[in-house]
Amino acid sequence: MSLFYKEEHLTCYNYKLSASANFAVTNFKKNDAPQVINIDRSVLFFILSGKVSVTCNQYKNREHQQGEVALIPRNHCCYVRIIEDTTVVSCSFLLNIDFCNHFSFRNLSNFIPDNFVYDFTILPIRKRVSEFLNLLAHCLEDGIECMHFHELMEKELFIFFRAYYSKEELASFFYPLLGKDLDFKDFVMSNYLLIKDLSEFASQANMSLPTFKRHFRETFGQPAH
């Protein structure tokens, strides 16, 4: 569907500004080369159609198909192999959002299931969320790219998360973004190419070397070296 006064939209100052959340629709073909994705924001990947295989850090070759949403935390590198023709709606966001005025990300820590071990949790795209995503995709394809549009859609999306998923589901899904380890992860991922020596890394993190090594193993599941 075409926009009225398209030139006014395209020349608007707000089309040039970066929003706190950015949505995009991407189409992949089966024969497309594997995609390597480095991100400095957390990203939600909603598969509207098709199937892909995702490798992200220690999580290898996880199939992700139509009707599912995956979370890639910021400062992670992912390798995506296209298995079938695939359409993705992605939402990259900063961690300064809430589900609603009465429920924030911080609240999710209280709903992590007992003995939970994170294993790249995938959630189903519920019916109302699917309807929202399809309308959103059409609007983006029509050319609505205003900063305010993206920010309003972000708020609506997280209200849908609040409404159509249990708190336990959300805690399991957003687990990588919860707790004190996120700042440590960000620090390591932002500096590992700049700092080569573990002692200097520990010093920059204001930790003793044994504490840094222990924290690294707890956070990344492997020893620092």
Language-model segment annotations:
Residues 1-19, 139-142:
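A short, N-terminal "cap"/entry segment at the start of jelly-roll beta-barrel domains
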Residues 17-113:
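N-terminal regulatory/effector-sensing and dimerization cores
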Residues 48, 162, 189, 193:
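Short, locally clustered residues in the helix-turn-helix/winged-helix DNA-binding domain
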Residues 63, 147-151:
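Alpha-helix N-cap/helix-initiation sites
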Residues 105-133:
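Aromatic/histidine-rich interaction motifs
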Residues 125-138, 150-154, 171-205:
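A short, Lys/Arg-enriched amphipathic alpha-helix from helix-turn-helix/homeodomain DNA-binding modules
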Residues 160-167, 195-225:
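Basic/polar phosphate-binding segments, predominantly the helix-turn-helix DNA-binding elements
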